[in-house]
Amino acid sequence: MRTAPRSQLNRAIAPCRKRGPRRVAMVSMHTSPLEQPGTGDAGGMNVYVLQTARRLADRGVAVEIFTRATSSEQPPALSPSEGITVHYVPAGPFEGLSKGDLPSQLCAFTNGVLRAEAAQPPGYFDVIHSHYWLSGQAAWLAAERWGVPHIHSAHTLAKVKNLHLAAEDTPEPFTRVVGEEQVVAESDALVTNTSSEAEVLVDLYRADPDKVTVTPPGVDPEVFTPGDKLAARRRLGLPDDALVLGFAGRIQPLKAPDVLVRAVARLRALNPELAPRLRLVVVGGPSGNGADNPRWLHDLAAELGIADAVTFLKPRAGHELAEVFRACDVVGVPSYNETFGLVALEAQACGTPVVAAAVGGLTTAVADGHSGLLIRGHDETDWANALDKLVTDAPRRARLAAGALDHAARFTWSHTADDLLGAYGDAIQRRAVSPRRSPASKR
C-alpha cells in the first residue's frame, strides 16, 4: 500500500478547468436513478446520479443513463426530463436477484450497453461515467471499446465498509475488493465526494493522486427549504409541543437506526421529564441485512418500551421528506460509515440541526458545533447525552439551525455539475494527448 505525499493529494483535488463533452453515458447498473431513495438498494447515489444528470442537461450536455431492468413493465428507454434518457438494460431475471448476485450478470449487462451504443453514429459518446464498482466493471470495457475516457465514482468502498462493520452486518466479499481495485486502476479519472475519500482511494487502493478529483454533492434548494414547523407536525400527526428527533435512510445495520432507538430509550431513562414529549420519526424501508427481518426495528422499539414514541413512515420523495425534516427539532445520522451523507445536508437545508456519527463524509456534511454535532462512536449513552443537551436547550438549537442553513447553502448541484464538466474535459484532453492502450497490450 502506498501513501502519496500531501502535496500530490492537494494537486489531485484542485478545482478542474471548466470544459466538457456533448454527450455523457452514465452507468448505474444495480439501481435506477428513478427509484425511491430509502428502500432496497436506492439511496444517496440515486439522488446524485439524477441530480447531476439534470444539471448537466441544463448546461446543454445530453446524458444517457444505463441501468439494469428489474420489471417487465419498464420500457427499453424513457426520458424523465429534457436532455436525459434512462435505458433499462435486460440482464438476468427481473426478480430474484440481490445486489450480491449481480456480478453474474455483468456480461449480459455490458453487452446491452454496447449494443445500445452500436446503434448510434460513431463517436456518439464523449465520456462514460460509472457509479459503484459493478457499473465500473461494465464501463471499463465500454470505454475501451468506444475509445473514450472512463470516469468513476465509487460511492461506497468495500475496504472501508469492512473496517466499520456493524455487529450484525456481513463483510463485503473479496471479489468486490478485487473488482474495485481493477476499476480504480483502469479509470481515467476518479471523482470523490470529500478529500477524506480521496485519501482513502490513494492509501487503501493505491490510486494515482493525479487522477483524483474532489467534487462534493449538493442539495436541491427548491425542495429542501425551511418552512412552518407546526404545520409540518400537524400534517404528520405529531404534537405541537413534542421534541421530535428524525431519521431518514435505509433500515439496515450500516445506517444504525437502532442507535437512535436505543438513545431515545436511554434519554427517557436519564431525563424522565422529557419522556412524554419525546418522539422519534423513522423514514425508510428495509435493505441489506435489514431486509431479512423487515420489522426488526419495530421489535426493538417494543422491547425497549418506547413503541409509543416511535413513528415509522415509508420512504418518501423530496418535498414530503423535506416536510419531515421541518417537523423535527434534530435529525440523527448514526451510520457506521458514509461516503458523504446526503440526508444530513438535506436536513440542514431545511433549517434542522444534525447529530451525526463522526465518520467518513459526515465530517464534511456536518460542521461540528456550527450546523450540528458529531459524535465519536455509537454508544447509546453518548448519543442520549448529546441529544439531551440539544432538546433541552432551545437557544442552542436555534443557533445550530441558523448554522445548518449557512452550511448547507455552500453545497449546490450546480457547483457539482460544473466540477464534473471540468473533470470530464480534463479526462478528454488527457486521452487525446496520450491515448490509452488496451488491457491486452499491457500484459
Curated annotation (Swiss-Prot):
Gene Ontology BP annotations: mycothiol biosynthetic process
MF-aspect GO terms: acetylglucosaminyltransferase activity; D-inositol-3-phosphate glycosyltransferase activity; magnesium ion binding
UniProt entry tagged with the keyword Magnesium: yes
Record's catalysed reaction(s): 1D-myo-inositol 3-phosphate + UDP-N-acetyl-alpha-D-glucosamine = 1D-myo-inositol 2-acetamido-2-deoxy-alpha-D-glucopyranoside 3-phosphate + UDP + H(+)
Keywords linked to the UniProt accession: Glycosyltransferase, Magnesium, Metal-binding, Transferase
SUPFAM superfamilies on file: UDP-Glycosyltransferase/glycogen phosphorylase
InterPro entries: Glyco_trans_1 (IPR001296), Glyco_trans_4-like_N (IPR028098), Glycosyltransferase_grp1 (IPR050194), Mycothiol_biosynthesis_MshA (IPR017814)
Gene3D superfamilies: Glycogen Phosphorylase B
Residues where 1D-myo-inositol 3-phosphate binds: 30, 41-46, 99, 132, 156, 176
Binding residues for Mg(2+): 325-326, 328, 352
Residues reported in the UniProt entry to bind UDP-N-acetyl-alpha-D-glucosamine: 36-37, 44, 250, 255, 316, 338, 346
Known EC number: 2.4.1.250
Function: Catalyzes the transfer of a N-acetyl-glucosamine moiety to 1D-myo-inositol 3-phosphate to produce 1D-myo-inositol 2-acetamido-2-deoxy-glucopyranoside 3-phosphate in the mycothiol biosynthesis pathway.
NCBIfam families (alphabetical): mycothiol_MshA
Family of the protein in this entry: Belongs to the glycosyltransferase group 1 family. MshA subfamily.
Self-association and partners: Homodimer.
Protein name, as recorded: D-inositol 3-phosphate glycosyltransferase
